[in-house]
Protein backbone atom coordinates (compact mmCIF):
# COMPACT_ATOMS: atom_id res chain seq x y z
CA UNK A 1 0.00 0.00 0.00
CA UNK A 2 1.15 3.48 -0.79
CA UNK A 3 1.27 5.92 2.03
CA UNK A 4 1.02 9.68 2.35
CA UNK A 5 3.74 9.73 4.96
CA UNK A 6 6.64 12.06 4.25
CA UNK A 7 8.97 10.50 1.74
CA UNK A 8 12.72 10.62 2.10
CA UNK A 9 14.78 12.55 -0.38
CA UNK A 10 17.39 11.06 -2.63
CA UNK A 11 19.79 10.62 0.26
CA UNK A 12 21.12 12.55 3.16
CA UNK A 13 24.55 14.06 2.62
CA UNK A 14 26.13 11.56 5.01
CA UNK A 15 24.33 8.46 3.71
CA UNK A 16 26.74 5.68 2.77
CA UNK A 17 26.57 4.25 -0.71
CA UNK A 18 24.29 1.19 -0.88
CA UNK A 19 25.28 -1.04 -3.84
CA UNK A 20 21.87 -2.74 -3.69
CA UNK A 21 19.90 0.47 -4.25
CA UNK A 22 18.80 1.58 -7.72
CA UNK A 23 17.40 4.81 -9.07
CA UNK A 24 14.53 4.23 -11.50
CA UNK A 25 13.90 7.10 -13.90
CA UNK A 26 11.33 7.68 -16.63
CA UNK A 27 8.41 6.15 -14.76
CA UNK A 28 4.90 6.50 -16.10
CA UNK A 29 2.61 8.77 -14.10
CA UNK A 30 0.39 5.73 -13.57
CA UNK A 31 3.11 3.50 -12.12
CA UNK A 32 2.50 2.62 -8.47
CA UNK A 33 4.85 1.28 -5.84
CA UNK A 34 3.15 -2.10 -6.09
CA UNK A 35 3.66 -2.16 -9.83
CA UNK A 36 7.29 -1.12 -9.46
CA UNK A 37 7.91 -3.81 -6.84
CA UNK A 38 6.22 -6.46 -8.96
CA UNK A 39 8.30 -5.64 -12.04
CA UNK A 40 11.67 -5.64 -10.31
CA UNK A 41 10.75 -8.65 -8.20
CA UNK A 42 11.54 -10.82 -11.21
CA UNK A 43 15.22 -9.87 -10.90
CA UNK A 44 15.57 -10.59 -7.19
CA UNK A 45 14.02 -10.12 -3.78
CA UNK A 46 13.05 -6.48 -3.29
CA UNK A 47 13.78 -5.08 0.14
CA UNK A 48 12.34 -1.61 -0.37
CA UNK A 49 10.43 0.16 -3.13
CA UNK A 50 9.49 3.80 -3.44
CA UNK A 51 7.82 6.05 -6.03
CA UNK A 52 8.64 9.69 -5.38
CA UNK A 53 5.57 11.93 -5.25
CA UNK A 54 4.90 15.63 -5.00
CA UNK A 55 4.09 16.43 -1.36
CA UNK A 56 1.23 18.75 -2.34
CA UNK A 57 -0.45 17.12 -5.33
CA UNK A 58 0.58 13.55 -4.42
CA UNK A 59 1.27 12.94 -8.09
CA UNK A 60 4.21 10.83 -9.17
CA UNK A 61 7.36 12.77 -10.00
CA UNK A 62 8.35 10.19 -12.61
CA UNK A 63 11.12 8.44 -10.70
CA UNK A 64 11.65 6.19 -7.73
CA UNK A 65 14.00 3.80 -5.94
CA UNK A 66 14.27 0.06 -5.60
CA UNK A 67 16.51 -1.66 -3.06
CA UNK A 68 17.31 -5.34 -3.46
CA UNK A 69 18.24 -7.76 -0.70
CA UNK A 70 21.54 -8.48 -2.40
CA UNK A 71 23.64 -7.08 -5.22
CA UNK A 72 22.78 -9.95 -7.57
CA UNK A 73 19.42 -8.31 -8.27
CA UNK A 74 21.15 -5.09 -9.33
CA UNK A 75 23.47 -6.99 -11.64
CA UNK A 76 20.55 -8.75 -13.33
CA UNK A 77 18.74 -5.45 -13.90
CA UNK A 78 21.84 -3.86 -15.43
CA UNK A 79 22.45 -6.90 -17.61
CA UNK A 80 19.13 -6.33 -19.39
CA UNK A 81 19.46 -3.58 -22.00
CA UNK A 82 15.83 -2.44 -22.07
CA UNK A 83 13.15 -2.18 -19.40
CA UNK A 84 9.49 -1.31 -19.98
CA UNK A 85 6.85 -0.74 -17.34
CA UNK A 86 3.27 0.43 -17.88
CA UNK A 87 3.96 0.86 -21.63
CA UNK A 88 6.87 3.21 -20.93
CA UNK A 89 10.60 2.62 -21.23
CA UNK A 90 12.24 3.17 -17.87
CA UNK A 91 15.86 3.83 -16.98
CA UNK A 92 17.26 1.97 -13.94
CA UNK A 93 20.66 3.07 -12.66
CA UNK A 94 22.76 2.43 -9.59
CA UNK A 95 21.83 5.02 -6.98
CA UNK A 96 24.52 7.19 -5.42
CA UNK A 97 24.05 9.37 -2.34
CA UNK A 98 23.96 13.07 -3.01
CA UNK A 99 26.75 15.02 -1.40
CA UNK A 100 26.25 18.30 0.34
CA UNK A 101 27.39 21.30 -1.69
CA UNK A 102 30.68 22.57 -0.28
CA UNK A 103 30.44 26.04 1.18
CA UNK A 104 32.38 28.89 -0.29
CA UNK A 105 35.50 29.78 1.62
CA UNK A 106 35.20 33.18 3.24
CA UNK A 107 38.36 33.08 5.35
CA UNK A 108 41.59 32.04 3.68
CA UNK A 109 45.25 32.99 3.55
CA UNK A 110 45.54 32.42 -0.19
CA UNK A 111 44.46 34.68 -3.04
CA UNK A 112 44.24 34.23 -6.77
CA UNK A 113 45.91 36.90 -8.92
CA UNK A 114 44.87 37.07 -12.58
CA UNK A 115 45.73 39.24 -15.56
CA UNK A 116 49.46 39.59 -14.96
CA UNK A 117 51.56 41.02 -17.77
CA UNK A 118 53.98 38.77 -19.61
CA UNK A 119 57.07 40.43 -18.16
CA UNK A 120 55.87 40.24 -14.55
CA UNK A 121 57.95 37.94 -12.35
CA UNK A 122 57.09 36.19 -9.11
CA UNK A 123 59.37 38.65 -7.32
CA UNK A 124 57.35 41.54 -8.72
CA UNK A 125 54.17 39.98 -7.38
CA UNK A 126 55.66 39.24 -3.98
CA UNK A 127 57.17 42.70 -3.67
CA UNK A 128 53.87 44.38 -4.52
CA UNK A 129 51.76 42.45 -2.02
CA UNK A 130 54.26 42.81 0.82
CA UNK A 131 52.91 46.33 1.32
CA UNK A 132 49.73 44.73 2.71
CA UNK A 133 51.45 42.26 5.05
CA UNK A 134 53.87 39.39 5.28
CA UNK A 135 53.83 37.10 2.24
CA UNK A 136 54.52 33.44 3.01
CA UNK A 137 54.54 32.24 -0.57
CA UNK A 138 53.95 33.44 -4.13
CA UNK A 139 53.77 31.43 -7.32
CA UNK A 140 53.03 31.93 -11.00
CA UNK A 141 51.59 29.10 -13.07
CA UNK A 142 53.87 28.17 -15.97
CA UNK A 143 53.42 26.32 -19.22
CA UNK A 144 56.01 23.53 -19.44
CA UNK A 145 56.24 23.77 -23.21
CA UNK A 146 57.13 27.45 -23.47
CA UNK A 147 58.37 27.89 -19.89
CA UNK A 148 56.40 31.13 -19.70
CA UNK A 149 53.82 31.97 -17.09
CA UNK A 150 50.18 32.13 -18.11
CA UNK A 151 49.21 35.43 -16.59
CA UNK A 152 47.99 34.25 -13.21
CA UNK A 153 49.19 32.81 -9.95
CA UNK A 154 48.62 32.60 -6.20
CA UNK A 155 49.86 34.47 -3.17
CA UNK A 156 49.72 33.10 0.38
CA UNK A 157 49.80 35.54 3.28
CA UNK A 158 50.59 35.13 6.95
CA UNK A 159 47.00 35.71 8.05
CA UNK A 160 43.44 35.88 6.76
CA UNK A 161 43.17 39.52 7.78
CA UNK A 162 45.74 40.49 5.17
CA UNK A 163 43.68 38.72 2.52
CA UNK A 164 40.61 40.68 3.57
CA UNK A 165 42.56 43.89 3.19
CA UNK A 166 43.88 42.92 -0.26
CA UNK A 167 40.50 41.78 -1.59
CA UNK A 168 38.82 45.00 -0.54
CA UNK A 169 40.62 46.43 -3.57
CA UNK A 170 39.39 44.22 -6.38
CA UNK A 171 41.85 45.44 -9.01
CA UNK A 172 45.51 46.14 -8.32
CA UNK A 173 48.15 47.63 -10.60
CA UNK A 174 51.34 45.59 -11.02
CA UNK A 175 53.89 46.63 -13.65
CA UNK A 176 51.45 49.10 -15.22
CA UNK A 177 48.81 46.37 -15.65
CA UNK A 178 45.54 46.05 -13.79
CA UNK A 179 45.25 42.60 -12.21
CA UNK A 180 42.35 40.94 -10.44
CA UNK A 181 42.61 39.58 -6.91
CA UNK A 182 40.16 37.12 -5.37
CA UNK A 183 40.13 34.66 -2.53
CA UNK A 184 41.27 31.23 -3.63
CA UNK A 185 38.58 28.57 -3.36
CA UNK A 186 38.72 24.78 -2.95
CA UNK A 187 38.08 22.77 -6.08
CA UNK A 188 34.82 21.40 -4.68
CA UNK A 189 33.41 24.93 -4.65
CA UNK A 190 34.59 25.81 -8.15
CA UNK A 191 33.61 22.54 -9.85
CA UNK A 192 30.27 20.83 -9.12
CA UNK A 193 30.50 17.11 -8.50
CA UNK A 194 27.78 16.29 -11.00
CA UNK A 195 26.10 12.92 -10.78
CA UNK A 196 27.08 9.36 -11.36
CA UNK A 197 24.61 6.71 -12.33
CA UNK A 198 26.58 3.78 -13.53
CA UNK A 199 29.10 1.39 -12.13
CA UNK A 200 31.70 2.46 -14.64
CA UNK A 201 31.40 6.15 -13.87
CA UNK A 202 33.60 7.57 -11.16
CA UNK A 203 32.29 10.30 -8.93
CA UNK A 204 34.71 13.24 -8.82
CA UNK A 205 34.90 13.23 -5.04
CA UNK A 206 37.60 14.49 -2.77
CA UNK A 207 40.08 16.51 -4.79
CA UNK A 208 41.54 18.51 -1.95
CA UNK A 209 43.57 20.95 -4.00
CA UNK A 210 43.10 24.64 -3.45
CA UNK A 211 41.80 26.19 -6.60
CA UNK A 212 41.35 29.39 -8.38
CA UNK A 213 39.51 32.55 -7.43
CA UNK A 214 35.78 32.99 -7.83
CA UNK A 215 36.03 35.24 -10.85
CA UNK A 216 38.53 33.04 -12.63
CA UNK A 217 36.44 31.28 -15.21
CA UNK A 218 38.54 30.21 -18.16
CA UNK A 219 42.18 30.66 -17.41
CA UNK A 220 44.21 28.05 -19.20
CA UNK A 221 44.75 24.63 -17.83
CA UNK A 222 48.19 24.94 -16.47
CA UNK A 223 50.97 22.53 -15.66
CA UNK A 224 50.13 22.01 -12.02
CA UNK A 225 47.82 19.13 -11.31
CA UNK A 226 46.79 20.50 -7.94
CA UNK A 227 45.02 23.44 -9.53
CA UNK A 228 42.28 23.66 -12.11
CA UNK A 229 39.73 26.08 -13.53
CA UNK A 230 36.44 26.00 -15.34
CA UNK A 231 35.80 29.12 -17.39
CA UNK A 232 37.08 32.63 -17.46
CA UNK A 233 36.19 35.51 -19.70
CA UNK A 234 39.86 36.30 -19.85
CA UNK A 235 42.08 38.82 -18.15
CA UNK A 236 45.08 38.15 -20.35
CA UNK A 237 44.34 39.33 -23.90
CA UNK A 238 45.98 37.34 -26.65
CA UNK A 239 45.51 33.95 -25.04
CA UNK A 240 43.05 31.20 -25.75
CA UNK A 241 42.04 29.09 -22.82
CA UNK A 242 41.23 25.40 -22.86
CA UNK A 243 40.42 23.23 -19.86
CA UNK A 244 40.91 20.46 -18.81
CA UNK A 245 43.54 19.54 -21.37
CA UNK A 246 46.07 21.76 -19.56
CA UNK A 247 47.14 23.42 -22.81
CA UNK A 248 47.05 26.99 -23.97
CA UNK A 249 48.35 28.76 -27.01
CA UNK A 250 49.40 32.34 -27.13
CA UNK A 251 47.74 34.17 -29.96
CA UNK A 252 50.24 36.69 -31.40
CA UNK A 253 48.97 40.19 -31.94
CA UNK A 254 48.75 41.00 -35.64
CA UNK A 255 51.41 43.41 -36.85
CA UNK A 256 49.09 44.94 -39.42
CA UNK A 257 45.42 44.53 -40.33
CA UNK A 258 44.72 41.95 -42.98
CA UNK A 259 43.18 43.60 -46.01
CA UNK A 260 40.58 41.74 -48.06
CA UNK A 261 41.37 40.38 -51.47
CA UNK A 262 40.11 42.37 -54.43
CA UNK A 263 39.31 39.34 -56.49
CA UNK A 264 36.01 38.81 -54.69
CA UNK A 265 34.67 42.33 -55.46
CA UNK A 266 35.74 43.94 -58.74
CA UNK A 267 36.35 47.66 -58.64
CA UNK A 268 34.08 48.11 -61.60
CA UNK A 269 31.18 47.34 -59.29
CA UNK A 270 31.70 50.76 -57.73
CA UNK A 271 31.61 52.63 -61.01
CA UNK A 272 34.25 53.81 -63.48
CA UNK A 273 35.33 56.76 -61.35
CA UNK A 274 36.08 54.54 -58.37
CA UNK A 275 38.10 52.15 -60.49
CA UNK A 276 40.06 55.01 -62.02
CA UNK A 277 40.77 56.57 -58.63
CA UNK A 278 41.98 53.26 -57.23
CA UNK A 279 44.24 52.64 -60.21
CA UNK A 280 45.70 56.13 -59.90
CA UNK A 281 46.42 55.58 -56.21
CA UNK A 282 48.33 52.40 -56.93
CA UNK A 283 50.30 54.04 -59.76
CA UNK A 284 51.34 56.88 -57.47
CA UNK A 285 52.71 54.31 -55.05
CA UNK A 286 50.78 55.58 -52.06
CA UNK A 287 50.69 52.13 -50.55
CA UNK A 288 46.97 52.43 -49.95
CA UNK A 289 44.83 49.43 -50.59
CA UNK A 290 42.62 50.17 -53.63
CA UNK A 291 39.52 49.11 -51.73
CA UNK A 292 39.91 51.73 -49.03
CA UNK A 293 40.22 54.61 -51.52
CA UNK A 294 42.40 56.31 -48.90
CA UNK A 295 44.07 59.55 -50.10
CA UNK A 296 47.86 59.83 -49.99
CA UNK A 297 49.41 61.46 -46.90
CA UNK A 298 49.13 65.23 -46.83
CA UNK A 299 46.33 65.45 -49.38
CA UNK A 300 42.86 66.82 -48.73
CA UNK A 301 40.16 64.27 -49.39
CA UNK A 302 37.21 65.36 -51.43
CA UNK A 303 34.89 63.70 -48.93
CA UNK A 304 34.95 63.17 -45.19
CA UNK A 305 36.04 59.58 -45.63
CA UNK A 306 37.04 56.94 -48.07
CA UNK A 307 33.84 54.91 -48.14
CA UNK A 308 31.40 55.29 -50.98
CA UNK A 309 27.87 56.51 -50.42
CA UNK A 310 25.02 54.15 -49.71
CA UNK A 311 23.70 54.62 -53.24
CA UNK A 312 26.78 52.92 -54.67
CA UNK A 313 26.39 49.34 -55.81
CA UNK A 314 28.26 46.61 -54.04
CA UNK A 315 28.21 44.73 -50.75
CA UNK A 316 28.99 47.61 -48.42
CA UNK A 317 25.68 47.30 -46.59
CA UNK A 318 26.16 43.56 -46.24
CA UNK A 319 29.72 44.08 -45.05
CA UNK A 320 28.80 46.34 -42.18
CA UNK A 321 25.19 45.33 -41.53
CA UNK A 322 22.11 47.44 -41.03
CA UNK A 323 21.29 49.20 -37.81
CA UNK A 324 18.68 46.63 -36.81
CA UNK A 325 20.89 43.66 -37.60
CA UNK A 326 22.82 41.68 -35.03
CA UNK A 327 26.19 42.46 -36.52
CA UNK A 328 29.55 42.66 -34.86
CA UNK A 329 29.74 46.34 -35.77
CA UNK A 330 26.62 47.19 -33.80
CA UNK A 331 28.41 46.23 -30.58
CA UNK A 332 30.86 49.11 -30.95
CA UNK A 333 30.45 52.75 -30.04
CA UNK A 334 31.27 55.68 -32.25
CA UNK A 335 33.91 58.35 -31.83
CA UNK A 336 35.99 60.67 -33.98
CA UNK A 337 37.52 58.74 -36.85
CA UNK A 338 38.58 59.18 -40.48
CA UNK A 339 35.66 56.93 -41.37
CA UNK A 340 32.40 58.74 -42.22
CA UNK A 341 29.63 58.95 -39.68
CA UNK A 342 26.96 59.25 -42.33
CA UNK A 343 25.61 56.89 -44.88
CA UNK A 344 25.29 53.96 -42.48
CA UNK A 345 22.36 53.42 -40.21
CA UNK A 346 24.47 52.42 -37.20
CA UNK A 347 27.04 55.25 -37.45
CA UNK A 348 30.37 53.65 -38.22
CA UNK A 349 32.36 56.80 -37.51
CA UNK A 350 34.57 55.55 -34.75
CA UNK A 351 37.65 53.58 -33.91
CA UNK A 352 35.47 50.58 -33.04
CA UNK A 353 35.92 50.47 -29.30
CA UNK A 354 34.14 47.49 -27.78
CA UNK A 355 31.61 48.53 -25.16
CA UNK A 356 32.29 45.37 -23.18
CA UNK A 357 35.76 46.54 -22.16
CA UNK A 358 35.88 47.77 -18.59
CA UNK A 359 39.10 48.71 -16.87
CA UNK A 360 41.02 46.96 -19.59
CA UNK A 361 39.19 43.67 -19.13
CA UNK A 362 36.33 41.94 -20.87
Curated annotation (Swiss-Prot):
Identify the InterPro entries for this entry. Answer: MSI_RRM2, Nucleotide-bd_a/b_plait_sf, RBD_domain_sf, RRM_dom
Q: What is the effect of changing residue 160 to Q?
A: In a breast cancer sample; somatic mutation
The source's domain of life comes to Eukaryota
Q: Which residues form the RRM domain?
A: 20-110, 109-186
Q: Does the keyword section mention Phosphoprotein? A: yes
GO aspect biological process, one term: central nervous system development
Q: What is known of its domains?
A: The first RNA recognition motif binds more strongly to RNA compared to the second one.
Similarity remark: Belongs to the Musashi family.
* Described purpose of this protein according to its UniProt entry: RNA binding protein that regulates the expression of target mRNAs at the translation level. Regulates expression of the NOTCH1 antagonist NUMB. Binds RNA containing the sequence 5'-GUUAGUUAGUUAGUU-3' and other sequences containing the pattern 5'-[GA]U(1-3)AGU-3'. May play a role in the proliferation and maintenance of stem cells in the central nervous system.
Protein name per UniProt:
RNA-binding protein Musashi homolog 1
Q: Which gene encodes it?
A: MSI1
